[in-house]
C-alpha cells in the first residue's frame, strides 16, 4: 500500500520528524518498504483567468485567448482544449516556464498568431496520466499565484508492506491508531457521516450461504452524475497511492478503502432484479466480465446474484451486466463480511490481488455501516443523487466477537525477561483500545474489533512490547532450555559417501523446498495423509513432503522443457509423515533419492545411443549400498508401488527391513507430471542403516578356485532372487561365490517355465577342493532347490 505522509498527518500529527515517523510505522509491525520524496518537475506555472475566448480564423480546433495572470498586460495564448472557455481560471505556463521531460515554454507563432504561453492539463504537469483536459480552478482562486505552491505537491510517498495477520494496518485509519498509541495521543473521533434516506426504495437481501457470508449492508443511490471530474484533493491522494482512475465512483470507493480499510462494492442498480441473493454457485454456472472474459464456477464458489443471473463474486469481481460505466445513473452500494476461513480459498481460486485479499480478511464489522455512510456522503457531494435507506442483513455475527484473554503479570515478566509495572501495562493496553479489567495479578482483556489476530496471551504480550518499544527491553544473557538431539554422524557420513559416488557417476545434486503442492503429492501417494501447513507461502507449497520424488520429478520436467536429453539428479533431505507414536505426532526421516531420464550417453560417433533403463539406476544404487553394507544383506522384491510402473517396481530391504523403493514412473502420471516413460527413480531411508559393522578384511586364499555351473527349470512366477538366496543359505559355512549368469523364459509349450543358469565358484583357504566333494555339495544343493521350488535340473 502507498500513501502520502500528509494524508496520514491529517489524521494524526505527532510532533516528530518524517524519519522518526517512518521508524514508528515499522516499529508498529507495519514494514516501511520505501519512502519517496515527491517533487513535481514544473516551474513558472501560475493561475490565470480567461477573459476573452474566440475561435482561430484559420482553424476551428484552435481558440485565441486573452488570459489575465495578475499583470498589467494580458497574455495572448492559442489553445485547442475542448473545455477551454471564457471566465474559467486555468494553469498558465508562461514564457520561460519548465515542464516535466525538460520542456521549456517559448513564445511562438501558431497558425499566424502569437502564443505567449500554454494552458496546462494535469498530464502536462506530470501528475495524472489520464487527465488531458486543462486544469480548472475554483472561482475563488487568486489570479497570479504559483500553481506549485497552490497544489502543495511536495510530500513523502510511503510504501508499506504488511503480513496477512495485520490487515488493520492497511489503511490511514489503522496506521493512525498505531502511531497514536506509540506517541500516547488520541485520534479524533470519526466525523458524523450519517446520510438520511430521501427515498424509501431498497433492494432486499437474502443470505442463503450464511456460513460463508456473515452480513451484508447495501443502499440504493439514484440520479447520480457519474461523468463529473474527481476533485483535485482526492485526485492527489489517489495519485500518490497509485490507484487513480478516470471513473469518479471507482475513485470514491478507492478513497474510502485506503482511508478506512473497508472494501465496498458498486453495482448498476438498474440491472438488478428484485433482490440480491448470497449463495453458492451452481454446477457449470459461468460469470462473464468485461471484454467477454469468462469465469467457470463450481459449487464451492460464493456468488451474489439476483433471481436471474450472477451479479458478482467476492473481491469486487462484477458481471459485465452490472458493472458501472459512463451511462450509469442509479447505483447499489454494498459492504459484506466474508468468513475468513473461506477467504483463502476464494483468493487462490480466483487469483485475486493480494492487497484486496488482506482488506477483505480484515473487515471491521463495526465499521461497515460507517464506510457506506462515508462513501454515500462523498458521492452526494461530488456526483449528486438521492439515497435510499441502508438495508442490512446479519448472520452468525457472534463469530466476530473477540474472546476474553487472561494476561498474567508473572507470565508477561517471564517472557520479556524483566519487570514492568502494572500501571504501565494498563496504560499501554488502554492506548491500544483494549477493554480490560485488572484482578491483582492478571488482566482480563478484549482486543478491539479490528484486531482479529489477537488470539492468545502471547499475542497481547507482543502488542504491549510494540508500544513499550523493543529498544527499552533490557539486554540479559539468554537462558537455554534446549533438548538437543545427538548429531547422527553415521547418517552424515552416508550422505557424503553417497553424494561422492553419484557425482562420479554423472549425477547433479538438487535442493528443493520441503513444502510441495498437495495435488502432486496426492497423484504419487493417493493413500497417504498430507501434513498441511496452516499458513502456507502459497497453495503450491501448502503441505510437507512425504517423499523427495515430487521435487525430483519437477526438476526432471523443468530440464526436459529446456531440451536436456540426458538427466541424472539426486537429492537428500528430511521427509515428514503423520505418526501418532512420534513426538508431536510427526515422523521425520532422512531420505536419499535419485532420478534418471533420457539417453544413457551423449550423442557421439562411436557408441549407439540408447535410453536409460531400470538396471542403470539399480546399478548406481547398488554402488551406494555396496559402500554402506554387504550386498547380500540387500534384497530387491518385486512389488506394485503407487507412483511407479506396476511391472517395473520393487521394494528394497536391508536385513528384512523395508528401506526404500525403485522403479519406472507410472505411465498414468507421465502427462500430469510432464515426464517421459524413460524416467526412473529410487528412494532409500538412511535412518535404517544402524549397527553397520565394519567390513572384514581377509587374507586371499593361495589355493585355486573350482567352478560348477548348473541350469534348472522353475516356474516363471518364482523370483530368481529367492533361488539364489536359498543357495547362499545352503553354502553359508563355505566360501562360495554364487552368481546368476543366464535366464531364459520358455513359451507355453513348457508350461510357463523359465531356465536359470547359476554358477558356483568354490575356494578353500587351507586346501584344494576335490571333485567328489564339490559334486556332492552341488547334488545336495539341487535337492534342496527341488524340494523348495520344484526345480528340475536340465541335462
Curated annotation (Swiss-Prot):
Please provide the Gene Ontology terms (biological process) for this protein.
phenylalanyl-tRNA aminoacylation
The top EC class is ligase
Name of this chain's protein: Phenylalanine--tRNA ligase beta subunit
Name the encoding gene, please.
pheT
The record's Gene Ontology cellular component field reads: phenylalanine-tRNA ligase complex
What GO molecular function terms would the record report? ATP binding; magnesium ion binding; phenylalanine-tRNA ligase activity; tRNA binding
Q: Which Gene3D superfamilies match?
A: 3.30.56.10, Bira Bifunctional Protein, Domain 2, Ferrodoxin-fold anticodon-binding domain, Nucleic acid-binding proteins, Phenylalanyl-trna Synthetase, Chain B, domain 3
- Its primary localisation, in coarse terms, equals cytoplasm
What keyword terms does UniProt attach to this protein? Answer: Aminoacyl-tRNA synthetase, ATP-binding, Cytoplasm, Ligase, Magnesium, Metal-binding, Nucleotide-binding, Protein biosynthesis, RNA-binding, tRNA-binding
According to its UniProt record, where is this protein located?
Answer: Cytoplasm
User: What's the source species for this entry?
Assistant: Buchnera aphidicola subsp. Acyrthosiphon pisum (strain APS)
Family classification = Belongs to the phenylalanyl-tRNA synthetase beta subunit family. Type 1 subfamily.
Binding-site list for Mg(2+) = 453, 459, 463
Residue stretches making up the FDX-ACB domain:
701-794
EC number(s) reported in the record: 6.1.1.20
Disulfide bonds, paired cysteine numbers: none
The residues covered by the tRNA-binding domain are 39-148
Cofactor(s) named in the record? Mg(2+)
Q: How is the cofactor bound?
A: Binds 2 magnesium ions per tetramer.
The chemistry this enzyme catalyses reads: tRNA(Phe) + L-phenylalanine + ATP = L-phenylalanyl-tRNA(Phe) + AMP + diphosphate + H(+)
Amino acid at each position: 500500500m502507498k500513501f502520502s505522509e500528509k494524508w496520514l498527518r491529517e489524521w494524526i500529527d505527532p510532533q516528530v520528524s518524517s524519519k522518526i515517523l517512518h521508524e514508528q510505522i515499522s516499529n508498529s509491525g507495519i514494514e516501511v518498504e520505501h519512502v519517496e520524496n515527491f517533487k513535481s518537475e514544473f516551474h513558472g506555472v501560475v493561475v490565470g483567468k480567461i477573459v476573452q475566448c474566440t475561435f482561430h480564423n484559420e482553424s476551428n480546433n484552435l481558440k485565441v485567448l486573452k488570459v489575465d495572470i495578475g499583470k498589467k498586460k494580458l497574455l495572448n495564448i492559442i489553445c485547442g482544449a475542448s473545455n477551454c472557455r471564457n471566465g474559467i481560471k486555468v494553469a498558465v505556463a508562461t514564457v520561460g516556464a519548465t515542464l516535466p521531460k525538460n520542456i521549456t515554454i517559448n513564445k511562438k507563432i501558431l497558425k499566424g498568431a502569437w502564443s505567449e504561453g500554454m494552458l496546462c492539463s494535469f498530464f502536462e504537469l506530470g501528475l495524472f496520466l489520464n487527465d488531458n483536459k486543462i486544469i480548472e480552478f475554483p472561482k475563488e482562486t487568486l489570479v497570479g499565484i504559483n500553481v506549485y505552491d497552490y497544489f502543495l505537491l511536495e510530500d513523502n510517498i510511503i510504501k508499506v508492506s504488511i503480513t496477512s495477520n495485520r490487515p488493520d494496518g492497511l489503511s490511514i485509519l489503522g496506521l493512525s491508531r498505531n502511531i497514536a498509541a506509540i506517541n500516547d495521543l488520541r485520534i479524533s473521533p470519526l466525523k458524523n457521516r450519517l446520510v438520511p434516506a430521501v427515498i424509501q426504495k431498497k433492494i432486499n437481501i437474502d443470505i442463503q450461504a450464511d456460513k460463508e457470508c456473515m452480513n451484508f449492508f447495501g443502499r440504493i443511490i439514484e440520479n447520480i452524475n457519474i461523468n463529473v471530474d474527481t476533485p483535485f484533493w482526492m485526485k492527489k491522494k489517489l495519485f500518490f497511492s497509485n490507484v487513480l482512475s478516470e471513473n469518479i465512483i471507482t475513485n470514491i470507493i478507492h478513497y474510502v478503502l485506503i482511508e478506512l480499510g473497508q472494501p465496498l462494492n458498486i453495482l448498476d442498480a438498474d440491472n438488478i432484479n428484485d433482490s440480491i441473493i448470497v449463495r453458492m454457485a451452481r454446477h457449470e454456472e459461468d460469470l462473464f466480465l468485461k471484454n467477454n472474459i469468462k469465469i467457470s464456477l463450481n459449487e464451492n464458489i460464493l456468488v451474489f446474484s439476483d433471481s436471474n443471473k450472477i451479479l458478482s463474486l467476492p473481491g469486487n469481481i462484477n458481471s459485465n451486466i452490472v458493472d458501472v460505466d459512463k451511462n450509469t445513473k442509479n447505483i447499489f452500494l454494498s459492504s459484506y463480511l466474508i468468513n475468513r476461513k473461506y477467504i483463502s480459498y476464494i483468493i487462490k481460486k480466483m487469483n485475486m490481488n493480494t492487497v484486496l485479499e488482506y482488506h477483505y480478511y480484515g473487515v471491521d464489522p463495526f465499521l461497515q455501516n460507517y464506510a457506506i455512510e462515508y462513501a454515500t456522503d462523498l458521492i452526494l457531494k461530488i456526483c449528486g443523487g438521492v439515497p435510499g435507506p441502508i438495508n442490512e442483513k446479519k448472520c452468525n455475527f457472534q463469530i466476530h466477537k473477540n474472546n476474553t484473554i487472561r494476561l498474567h503479570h508473572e507470565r508477561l515478566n517471564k517472557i520479556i525477561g524483566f519487570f514492568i509495572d502494572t500501571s504501565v501495562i494498563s496504560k499501554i493496553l488502554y492506548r491500544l483500545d483494549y477493554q480490560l479489567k485488572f484482578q491483582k495479578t492478571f488482566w482480563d482483556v478484549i482486543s478491539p474489533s479490528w484486531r482479529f489476530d489477537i488470539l492468545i496471551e502471547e499475542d497481547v504480550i507482543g502488542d504491549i512490547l510494540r508500544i513499550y518499544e523493543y529498544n527499552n527491553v533490557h539486554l540479559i544473557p539468554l537462558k537455554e532450555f534446549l533438548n538437543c538431539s545427538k548429531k547422527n554422524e553415521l547418517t552424515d557420513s552416508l550422505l557424503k559417501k553417497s553424494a561422492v559416488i553419484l557425482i562420479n557417476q554423472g549425477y547433479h545434486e538438487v535442493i528443493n523446498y520441503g513444502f510441495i503442492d498437495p495435488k502432486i503429492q496426492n497423484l504419487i501417494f493417493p493413500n497417504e495423509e498430507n501434513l498441511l501447513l496452516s499458513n502456507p507461502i502459497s497453495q503450491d507449497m501448502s503441505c510437507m513432503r512425504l517423499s523427495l520424488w515430487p521435487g525430483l520429478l519437477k526438476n526432471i520436467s523443468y530440464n526436459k522443457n529446456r531440451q536436456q536429453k540426458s538427466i541424472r539428479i539426486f537429492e537428500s533431505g528430511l521427509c515428514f509423515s503423520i505418526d501418532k507414536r512420534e513426538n508431536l505426532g510427526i515422523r521425520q526421516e532422512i531420505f536419499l533419492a535419485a532420478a534418471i531420464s533420457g539417453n544413457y550417453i551423449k550423442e557421439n560417433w562411436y557408441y549407439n545411443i540408447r535410453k536409460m533403463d531400470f538396471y542403470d539406476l539399480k546399478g548406481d544404487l547398488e554402488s551406494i549400498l555396496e559402500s554402506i553394507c554387504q550386498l547380500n544383506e540387500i534384497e530387491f522384491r518385486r512389488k506394485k508401488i503407487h507412483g511407479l510402473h506396476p511391472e517395473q517396481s520393487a521394494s528394497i530391504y536391508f536385513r528384512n527391513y523395508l528401506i526404500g523403493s525403485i522403479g519406472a514412473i507410472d505411465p498414468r502420471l507421465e502427462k500430469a507430471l510432464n515426464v517421459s516413460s524413460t524416467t526412473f527413480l529410487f528412494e532409500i531411508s538412511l535412518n535404517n542403516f544402524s549397527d553397520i559393522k565394519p567390513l572384514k578384511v581377509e587374507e586371499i586364499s593361495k589355493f585355486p578356485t573350482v567352478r560348477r555351473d548348473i541350469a534348472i527349470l522353475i516356474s516363471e512366477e518364482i523370483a530368481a532372487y529367492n533361488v539364489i538366496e536359498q543357495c547362499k543359505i545352503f553354502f553359508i559355512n563355505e566360501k562360495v561365490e554364487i552368481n546368476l549368469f543366464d535366464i531364459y523364459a520358455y513359451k507355453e509349450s513348457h508350461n510357463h517355465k523359465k531356465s536359470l543358469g547359476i554358477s558356483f565358484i568354490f575356494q578353500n583357504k587351507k586346501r584344494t577342493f576335490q571333485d567328489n566333494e564339490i559334486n556332492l555339495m552341488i547334488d545336495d544343493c539341487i535337492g534342496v532347490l527341488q524340494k523348495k521350488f520344484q526345480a528340475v535340473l536340465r541335462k
